[in-house]
Each structure stands twice: as C-alpha cells, then as structure tokens.
Amino acid sequence: MGARSSVLSGKKTDELEKVRLRPGGKKRYCLKHIIWAVNELDRFGLAESLLESKEGCHKILTVLAPLVPTGSENLKSLFNTVCVIYCLHAEEKVKDTEEAKKIAQRHLAADTEKMPATSRPTAPPSGGNYPVQQIAGNYVHMPLSPRTLNAWVKLVEEKKFGAEVVPGFQALSEGCTPYDINQMLNCVGDHQAAMQIIREIINEEAADWDQQHPIPGPLPAGQLRDPRGSDIAGTTSTVEEQIQWMYRAQNPVPVGNIYRRWIQIGLQKCVRMYNPTNILDIKQGPKEPFQSYVDRFYKSLRAEQTDPAVKNWMTQTLLIQNANPDCKLVLKGLGMNPTLEEMLTACQGIGGPGQKARLMAEALKEALTPAPIPFAAAQQKAGKRGTVTCWNCGKVGHTAKQCRAPRRQGCWKCGKQGHIMSKCPERQAGFLRVRTLGKEASQLPHDPSASGSDTICTPDGPSRGHDTSGGDTICAPCRSSSGDAEKLHEDGETAEREPRETLQGGDRGFAAPQFSLWRRPVVRACIEGQPVEVLLDTGADDSIVAGIELGSNYTPKIVGGIGGFINTKEYKDVEIEVVGKRVRATIMTGDTPINIFGRNILNTLGMTLNFPVAKIEPVKVKLKPGKDGPKIRQWPLSKEKILALKEICEKMEKEGQLEEAPPTNPYNTPTFAIKKRDKNKWRMLIDFRELNKVTQDFTEVQLGIPHPAGLAEKRRITVLDVGDAYFSIPLDPNFRQYTAFTLPSINNAEPGKRYIYKVLPQGWKGSPAIFQYSMRKVLDPFRKANSDVIIIQYMDDILIASDRSDLEHDRVVSQLKELLNDMGFSTPEEKFQKDPPFKWMGYELWPKRWKLQKIQLPEKEVWTVNDIQKLVGVLNWAAQLFPGIKTRHICKLIRGKMTLTEEVQWTELAEAELQENKIILEQEQEGSYYKEGVPLEATVQKNLANQWTYKIHQGNRILKVGKYAKVKNTHTNGVRLLAHVVQKIGKEALVIWGEIPVFHLPVERETWDQWWTDYWQVTWIPEWDFVSTPPLVRLAYNLVKDPLEKVETYYTDGSCNRASKEGKAGYVTDRGKDKVKVLEQTTNQQAELEAFALALQDSGPQVNIIVDSQYVMGIVAGQPTETESPLVNQIIEEMIKKEAIYVGWVPAHRGLGGNQEVDHLVSQGIRQVLFLEKIEPAQEEHEKYHGNVKELVHKFGLPQLVAKQIVNSCDKCQQKGEAVHGQVNAELGTWQMDCTHLEGKVIIVAVHVASGFIEAEVIPQETGRQTALFLLKLASRWPITHLHTDNGANFTSQDVKMAAWWIGIEQTFGVPYNPQSQGVVEAMNHHLKNQIDRIRDQAVSIETVVLMAAHCMNFKRRGGIGDMTPAERLVNMITTEQEIQFFQAKNLKFQNFQVYYREGRDQLWKGPGELLWKGEGAVLIKVGTEIKVIPRRKAKIIRHYGGGKELDCGTDMEDTRQAREMAQSGQVPEA
C-alpha cells in the first residue's frame, strides 16, 4: 500500500476530488479510482511507482497511447485516469477528464517531435506496437519485450479464455509478425486443449489459403516467392521473409495480419467452448442492478463471432428485451434507440444499493419484531429434550431417517395401515377436517351418521384411540374437562357460554374442545380481563373486537372488510384467554359489526384450516398441438420470500391443494411472493404466462356481470359466497404435471422442493372457464328443482331471491349451502348475508329497491392523468343510477397523447362539472326491479353541450338511467347524435332484459323522417313516440334538394398557396357580381369555407350556391347544428337566417360557366389550374358498366372525392347502407350457391367467398339435375373443395350429392345470417339484381343481361383486399396457393440445415444463414431479411444442432455428382 498511498499528496488529492469524470457530470474522481489504476497497471507489466511522478506518468502514457484506439474499455479508463494524475503532477488546472486528455496528448505529441529522426521508430501502417521498426531506411525486427509477453500470459491465466482474451490479443499483437505471434502462443504453458483447437484452425485456414492461391510457375533467380499457408503460420518462413512480404513495394502480403485473423478465429472458438453462455440467455435478474446486467451482456457479446451490424442489433433490441420488468418499463420510456449512458443513468436506482438497503431495512425491522411464541412451542422450550427414539424400529439413539432397519409399513404414529404419519388423525388436529371424496359429512345437524364432520380442535389433542365420531359431540377427554362445553353445541346455539378449561394430555401436549361448524363458531374470550364473544374466522388475517378499552398505547390502522374500510387501534402483546388457554398476540379495536379472531390468533392457538376438494369430475385439458409445457428456471428469491412461500406451500399441501412433484417431472414455472394490502402477510403468485401461451384456448362463458335492474322483484333475498373457489375444483390429473414449480433454498443448502397443483391454480387461463362450467353443472339441477327461485351466480358470488315464505326461503338457502358443502365447496359464514342491505357486485340490495354502494369522489391537490381516468370511471359507474352525471369537460383534460403520471391542469368548465356531479351524488337515488308483463320504456332527454341522459323505466318505476356524450364527428347535429343514443339503449336493453323498450324521443316525427329519408345510415330503427320535453331536437335550416328558380346563383371557390400559406376566397354570381377576400395563414379547406360564408352573407333570403369542394359539401349536407369550428358556427348562423338554400357541387371548372370564372378569379398568383380531362371518360365508363369508386380511381387516376361524386351523382347507384353480419369460412376452395328469381326466370348464383368472384346464369328449372350440371360446370373452371348452400330441395337432392361426391367436395347447409350461413351469396344476389337494373336497357333477354352483369361485377368492381377486382383477386389467390405449396415442398429439404459462409476476400467465416436452395455451383441462403448467393467453395452446410457431417467444405470434401443426383431425386441432404 506504500505506493498507493503516496501517489498524490494531500493537496493534490483535494485537487483530484474536484475533477469531474465527464464534462458537466455530477460524479468526480476519488481515491478508489487511483487504487483501481494501480491494480490495472500490473496487467500491463508497469510498476506502481510510476504514478508518483510526472515523468513516470509520461512513461505510462507513451506505452498506453498506441493501444487506446483498439483497446478495451478498461484500457481506455486507465489511460484517462493516468492523464488526470499526470496533469495534477504537472500542476495543470483541469475541470474534467476530457481537458486532462487534451493536455496529456499535447505533451506526448511535443515530445515525439523532439526525438531525432534516426532514433524515433516509424510504426508500420498496420499497428501501434513496434516489433518491426524502420531505422535509417531499413526495416529491423525487434523481438517482443518480456513485458508484452508477461501481459499476454497474465491475461490468459486471469480470464481463462473469457471474452476479454480476443480484444486483448488484438491489442498486444498489433503489428506483429507470425514469428512474434508464435512466440506469444508458445508462452501459454497450460490450456493445451485450447492450443490444439487453435492449431486445427490454423491448419484448416492454411489449407484454404493454398487452395485459393495456387503455386505459380518457376520464378527468376533472386525473386522472392509468394507465401504459402505454412509460411503465413511461420513454420516454413524466416523473420526476414515475413518482413519482406509485409513491406515490399509491389503486392505486399500482410502475413502478420492474416495470421492474427486465423488466431482470432481459434480464440473465438475457445471462448465459446469455455463460456457456453449464449447471448440470448443473458437476462437480468429481478433484483440485479442494471449495470451488472450490462457488464454480463457485453462480456458475452464480445465472445459472439458475428459482424458489427448484428452486434449493433443485439445491443439495441436484446439489451432492453431481456431486462427485468422494472428496468424494461423505464427503458421503454426513453424512446427509440437510447444511448447506453442514458440507459445506465435511468436505471441506476433500480436493483442498486439504495433499493437493497430499503429491502434490508424492511427485513431487519420485521426480524427485530418479537414474534409471539405459541403455547406448544413455549412448553417445548421450557422442558428438556428427551432421548431420541427411532419411530421405525423403536430403538434409542438414532432417528427414523438414520435407521437402517427395513421400513415399517403403515403409520409411524398410531401403527394403523392406510395413511402416513404426516396425515395421522391422532397427530394432526385442524380447524377443518379434510373430508374424503367418497364419504362426505353433512353440514346440517340432522345427519347423525356423519363421521368426520368439520370440527375445530387445537393440535395434539386426544391420545391414541381417541374417539372423535359424531359430528355434533365433544370428544371424551375434552368433555370431561370442559365444564359446560357440552351445552355449547346443543341445537347449534346456547344461551350461556361458560369459559372452557383445558387439560394437559400428558407429554402429548394439551386437549381442547372440538365442536361442529354447522353454526358459527362463536366462543367467549377474555382480553386483558374483559370478557367478549368472538367469531373464530379463518378468512380474516387480523383480529378485531369492539366495546373494550385497552389503554392509549396503540397504533392507528385502517383495515378493509366487507363493509368497507374501518379505522382501528392496534395493540400489541395483549393477553388473551380463550378455551382455557392464555396467549399473547396483536389485536385491534374498532367499530366492527362482529368481533373476530383472525388467523394471527388462531395460528398461535395451533388451529389450521383444511379445505375439502370438490367431488367434481375434472375437465380434460390439453396443450396446444405441437407444444410442450414451460421449462423456465426459478429466479433467485430473498430469504423472507422463501420462508413465506415455504409456509404457504406446506399449508396448501396439508389441505390437499398441492402435492410433491416427482423427480421425473421436467417442467417448471417461476414462483414469487408479494405483500398483501396490510403489508403483514404474503401472497404466493405463479408466473403462468408461458403455460398460458401453450395451453389450449377456452371459451368465455360469462360475457359480463349481472345488473340488479334486470332482477325480478322478489320477497326475500339472500347472498352467499363460495370460499377459495378455485381451490375447490380439481385439476385434470394428466395436466397437473405442467403446473410444477420449485421452492429454492437459501444459499442452495438443499435441493429445491417441487410441487404441482391438484386444484385450479390462480393465474392460469383455464381456471375461470372451468370454474364457471363446474358451478353451472352443480347449480343446474338445483335451478330445475326450484324453478320459482332466482339464482344469480357470477364467479364465487351467489344471489338467491324468491317469493316464498321466510321458512321456505331459508330452507332453500340451507339446501343450496348443503349441496355446495357436499360437493366440497365451502360457504364462509362471515360472507353469508341474510338480512338487508345486501352488498353484491358493488350494489346494495333491498327486496323492493337497489342502489349503488356509497361513492366517495377523491380529493387531491395534484391530479395526474391516471387520477382523471379513475375519476371518470367512478362517475360512469354512478351514471347508471344518478341522472345528470356529466364527464365531457373532465374527459377533455386528458385529450391527446399523455403519460399516466403527467400532471393535469383543471379548467373552469371541468371544475364546475365536477362540483355539479358532487352535488348530484349527495342525493339519494334508488332503482327498482323488473316486473314481468309491464311494458319497458326508455325516455331520452337532451342536456346542454351535446350531452344526453336517458332513463329506462316501467311506468314511474325507474330501473336504470344512463348518459351519452360521445361525439364521433367534428360537425354533427342532434338527430345523428340521437340515433347513436337510441342504438346504445337498444343494445343495453337486449343484454339486460332481452327486449327492446318503447322509446320516447325529444324530436318531431317530421324532422326525424326527413333526416332519415335523406341520410339513412343504420339497419335498425325502433318503435318510438314523440315527447315534447324541451329542448327539442330540430333541423335548424331548410336545405332544399332542387335549385330555386328566379334566385341568384353564387359560384364559390377558395385557394391557398401551400408554401406561403396565403390564399383567396370569393364568389361570382350569374348576374355579374363578384367578390374576392385575401386570406393569410390559411388552408385550402378554410379558404373554401370562407368563400361559402361570403356567399351566405351577401345573398338574400333564398339562394343557390354552387361549390367545387367536397369538404364544404359534406359539412353542409349533414345539416350540422353543433360544431367546434368558429367558422362553421358562423356558417350555421347565416344558414338559419335563410328561408331556403340550395347547395350544389360540380367536379370541374372547365366549361361550367360561373364556376370556371370564380376559379380564375381566386387562382391568380395562388395556384396552378387543375386539369381534369379524364372526368368525362370516367363518367362515360360509369354510365356503361356502373363500376365502383375504387375502379374509377384506379383506371382514370381521379381523386377519390371526384370519383365518389361521379358514383353518387348516378341515380342508379344510389342505395342505402347494408347491415354488417358475422364472418364466414373464407378458405380458397369455399363457394356458396343459391337460386334467385327475376322476371319469372330462375338465376343460379355461385360466389367464391374469399374473393367475391361470381358465376351466374339462367337455368330452365330449379331442379336438382340443373343444379348438379351447373356445379359440374363450376368445378371444371375453378378449384372447389367446399360448397355451402341453404336447405332447398334442389341443393339437398340426390343429383347434387352425387355430383359433389364425384368431384370430391364437402357440402354443408345452413340458415341465413349465421357465421356458417350462405349470407355471402344472399348479399351477392342483391348486388346482382342492382347491377342488372343498371344495365337492363342494354340487352333484350334476361339470359344475356345476367352474364353482362356478372362480367361487370367481376372485372369492373375494385376494392376490398389488395384493392383488386374479384377476378384479379381470385387468380392471385390461386397463384399464391400454388407458389406456397411449391416452396413448402422445396423448403422441406433444406429446413434443417444452416450455412456458414465467406464473402469476397474476407477470410472470416460468417453465419449461420438459413439454407433456401442448393445448386451445383452455388447455394441460396437467407441471413436476417437479406437473401444472398454464395459460391459452393465458400459455404459450409451443417445441421443446425451441430455435430453432423459437413457437406460443403470444398471439392475435396464432397462428391459433387452424388450431391447433384441426391438433389435431383428430391432427397434431403444428410447432415
């Protein structure tokens, strides 16, 4: 340490601590950097004392400077540190590392220039070392220094052929000759296996060199020969020859660099052998610091033999992809391609010392908290341990595990057969007995023969031979010592509950009362001398009592229960006396509806909860075809989590929910633990994501939650809960193996214990569906037997409602509970609700009414986007019962792309809306239940700002209310919004009640009919009545369809220069009037609107306006009354003032009178004239064939707006919208066929489902023979494998069946508008008839016009997938299918092979690439997304799993003729 401590004096040390590591950074140099630099110097053979002076640092820098450009990160860091120390010795003031480097490099350059030219070595152009030096014009070889050789040997010995060896060799061998490189290799004494691998690579590369560089003819005397492979390797050449080859004037051969590259290939192979970790396996642990993960990643990356582009891709994708979830979340927020410095800075706090310190502090706090010692444990501590006796042979001095005698059969505890000691009834006393599936005990007290009833007893209760039969009795030893304990269970309840005493059961512990659970287990206890009655509740984590005072030494705490959150006082180390036993535990006091002893006290008493497993047949489950179960290693866990998981798993194993996995089970899924809400208990979680991916898919059996408004009104209601629902359903035994998980041990002290689930696990994708299916099977018989009783079941919540008498209703509930208990389901008493109000699914229910549970809006100083989202969710939930709830302005606060944690600034409108909602929520609102036979009605009311409210009711009884505030269009009107409201209510009513209500809408029938006649957009209009509830929905202005006669006509236009944003808007009238307005910072659309507004302002009460803008026409035609645009709002106000308005649209300016004139008027200096010569041919084409919009756009190059207007202007192409139906089978060979009728003729139509291609013709009769002939004609033209028709007589005839059988196609039948129906051909019949109507006047006979219409539909109708016509699409699909089949057949030969290859003069092998094709002279390979052609002599083909026979190493390694014959015969090449 002498040199280390004397590197810098005290003053210089102070100066060092002021220097920053990076310019502008926060971190500064400290002493640890000097200590690190001293250790690193030893690797380069440099003395530590050199750092003590300026001259010594200068010497270090002269050695390191040539190595910096090709050196590792450690080398560069060492160089930077020495630069800083050099500046401190030279008394140079520096602020950061970069300044120090500049100063040091300036001094190095000056010293080099001062050296004499004859003595200064001139480095060859290839490197920074100087084995070959140019002195006086001659190249002289200087042997490698011992320092260099020592550094190389130390590198190999320390790193053991790690990833650092390759760049280290590159740096140390820079500029070396083969002689020098061989000297370096000979210095490595050990690792001869690695040396042999390098020698084999050298021999292989030398042979390739000789093959590529054949020996030329005889050379003239005195001329230097060209190097052979052995010359490059230094075995048959001298140092002088090597120098001449490297530095000759003509055709130099860098033998040193070539040999270095061969050695690098060998070293990389050794690195992969010594370090088998793949770069893909480098993943960050859950608590691993990000910097440590990055170090491991780059260490493995440096060992990868691939090009820099691939390494760059690995850095950009794998580094983030394989980070743990915490770091990955932070890294994704950095955007695309963050730098490594940004990633390290962002993740430095995750998994680092700070986080570890917090975890350690939390663990230490928990460890220092004195845990209450159970009574039995205290007894064992108090007494001395007796002599060890073997349970197997009975001898003293060893345990059963050490016993060498044959294993005794049966139980080691009681000697009986049929069970093992861990499950012995005399050893294990539980809160609930585990009931077998074969013989179940009744939960009701009237079953006297129920043996094994659920009981409570403390551990080590009765002695051997103890009789515990009889579900409602107390065991004999307990009965003899419990005083009045027999009265406790007499008829399930007792008027007087006396304290019970317990007796010590000899040396076996103690005996406690055991009592039936057919009633609530309520006992009397004394807490610090204060008597209370408490419920023993195994479902509660903590213990809470009311009505007692325990002093002021408490901690305030809030706990959650059925009724919400409760404020409590927590007292620790409180003395409790219960069932004759004293314990000390933590207890809370507060306003609880019932006193509860939870698991913290029950565990101290030694009580356990044993759940039965349901007697339900397991549902068979399989993995997806070709998939295997998860095999993911368990990641490291902290000590406290391991202990918590161990306790949880042991408990679940005792309860029959888990069992040990056999050692032959190869599957594993990671497990971990998290703290519960109270932060005192742990919850076990299994990461089933991989298992969910490979598990078969399940059907969602329940698509939503039930709503109380859909319940029928009943006299009595009861709510009960199924406890630990998933853990009551058995899992398919054949599938259990895939749920295996492992509990690791601390410091790997023992093998991890492995478990598999016997019941439905939480987190597995199949658990919800299987549970719902099982519950439906259990409840269906009960529902049928009690048809007058309503049973609503959602997951583990069950609601029972009936009009029966109280006694009959209670009997039904008891029968249902008994049924569930007999099937193995538990029904916890603490969640059993017999009296109103019933808390169910977020609602409070009474027999005659329902309401929402209390809603409390949050009060916050600072609001984030996430807070606003939660607030809107609460308000939307409340809107189903509270009328008038609005969220429009609150939702506007989070419009646009915002992060969840971004702070939100409230607007005045949003604050006012929130306050109004708070006032509404303060009022009491109640809903009613549904009454059969009473008409269902829906009343809609319009509020301000386009917000709508509605109520669904039966007379004056309100069932449900709601709101609607979605505005899908920027410019809209009330009728369109009203239509959306009606659709929403209709869907809602169908789901809840299964019927459509009668609507009361605030609109006049004339307004509604007028709007829907012109702008029909939906397929369903309900029955409705007019309601005169202001404000009424009205159409604000009179927009007529035909031009007004004797009224001035305005031609409007606007234009804008995109570069300058300057524009003009104006109009020209048919009476010679015109006007132009100059605009700034505008757009074409805004200019068009300005021109329209000018025409409205300057015109009279009646006006004709002609526009050439589809944008303006679309806005005006929709008759908007609401808009967010000030300009459109101005237009609306002007239009309201008019008596009548006609608005027309023209597509072109040429030859259209005033429209052409106004275009010239506003275009001067603004835009060029748009030539639309192709409009007239497009109109002629459409009048002939009536093609669609996309066909006109494709063929004539028209803008889509112009093409759309051409189609819309055609009176024969005007049609209403069509309903959207279910999906159909769209495979390539699927056709649908149907018959339709027109003009007394029968037209048979066949449609190719995938492409929409149609075949149609007129047939004489609708018979099976004619249909079969058409089917044969269709099959002779197109591939057909599946035909779908309706159930008509001609399609089900024997003729059609025989034709289908002969062709080899599958025929199916269906009904309209089902997913497997003939809906495609039904729709095509409609389109065919429309097309025939358009061209009917072009042909005489119906036969001709049908074929003409089919031609138009197949070749003149473009759109859909690929923007093709149906004919193009069908041909494309057939061609694609053939290509796929061809390439699949070819690819099967090569799919198991990979190719390593070399390119150009580069001798480095690259790959692997995927083999696509193997020809005689070359192979076709795929590398990433790039496809390459590689000569055979530069390619090696191997099996991807390695170890196979190489096929292409050159002409001497494969018989070309044999390979060609094999490829031609279609065989797969052998590996």
UniProtKB/Swiss-Prot annotation:
Residues 274-360 are annotated as: Dimerization/Multimerization of capsid protein p24. A zinc finger (CCHC-type) spans 388-405, 409-426. Protease: The viral protease is inhibited by many synthetic protease inhibitors (PIs), such as amprenavir, atazanavir, indinavir, loprinavir, nelfinavir, ritonavir and saquinavir. Use of protease inhibitors in tritherapy regimens permit more ambitious therapeutic strategies. Reverse transcriptase/ribonuclease H: RT can be inhibited either by nucleoside RT inhibitors (NRTIs) or by non nucleoside RT inhibitors (NNRTIs). Keywords: AIDS, Aspartyl protease, Capsid protein, DNA integration, DNA recombination, DNA-binding, DNA-directed DNA polymerase, Endonuclease, Eukaryotic host gene expression shutoff by virus, Eukaryotic host translation shutoff by virus, Host cell membrane, Host cytoplasm, Host endosome, Host gene expression shutoff by virus, Host membrane, Host nucleus, Host-virus interaction, Hydrolase, Lipid-binding, Lipoprotein, Magnesium, Membrane, Metal-binding, Multifunctional enzyme, Myristate, Nuclease, Nucleotidyltransferase, Phosphoprotein, Protease, Repeat, RNA-binding, RNA-directed DNA polymerase, Transferase, Viral genome integration, Viral nucleoprotein, Viral penetration into host nucleus, Viral release from host cell, Virion, Virion maturation, Virus entry into host cell, Zinc, Zinc-finger. Residues 1044-1167 form the RNase H type-1 domain. Mg(2+) 3 binds at residues 1234, 1286, 1322. Mg(2+) 2 binds at residues 1053, 1088, 1108, 1159. One of its GO terms (biological process) is proteolysis. Its EC number is 3.4.23.47, 2.7.7.49, 2.7.7.7, 3.1.26.13. Residues 7-31 are annotated as: Interaction with Gp41. A motif (Nuclear localization signal) lies at residues 26-32. A lipid is attached at residue 2 (N-myristoyl glycine). It catalyses: Endopeptidase for which the P1 residue is preferably hydrophobic; Endohydrolysis of RNA in RNA/DNA hybrids. Three different cleavage modes: 1. sequence-specific internal cleavage of RNA. Human immunodeficiency virus type 1 and Moloney murine leukemia virus enzymes prefer to cleave the RNA strand one nucleotide away from the RNA-DNA junction. 2. RNA 5'-end directed cleavage 13-19 nucleotides from the RNA end. 3. DNA 3'-end directed cleavage 15-20 nucleotides away from the primer terminus; 3'-end directed exonucleolytic cleavage of viral RNA-DNA hybrid; DNA(n) + a 2'-deoxyribonucleoside 5'-triphosphate = DNA(n+1) + diphosphate. This is Gag-Pol polyprotein. It comes from Human immunodeficiency virus type 2 subtype B (isolate UC1) (HIV-2). The lineage of its organism: Viruses, Riboviria, Pararnavirae, Artverviricota, Revtraviricetes. The gene is gag-pol.
